[in-house]
């Protein structure tokens, strides 16, 4: 299994937006990590604090399944920045090309009926995110037209 490695900036506080947790279990875990000052997505912590293994590690991103997948998703992957940043503006341009290549690869492997990409960049208190570390959700949708996957793009949703 691949393991990501890139040096990171010092994590900012807060690391987690607890009100964005989708379950009590997720909220409790985020509280524990926040108290310990651990960002679950920083490369040096992902192997010990994220349940799902890293399936691919690139120069700018690594890929893992979401520990808390969206209800109704056939598959839910996270493409996580190797750097502790919150915005795409903080990454070099070549990170975008690598992200697109990862998305194409996952789409060809999953062969979903449809694929939703959720990109929350910037302040998690406004974009509905739960972790202050840039990551992209790739959600493969069920083959049944009645299947619904909902995700939050605002804390007011």
PLM regions: where:
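HIT superfamily nucleotide-processing domains
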Residues: 2-157
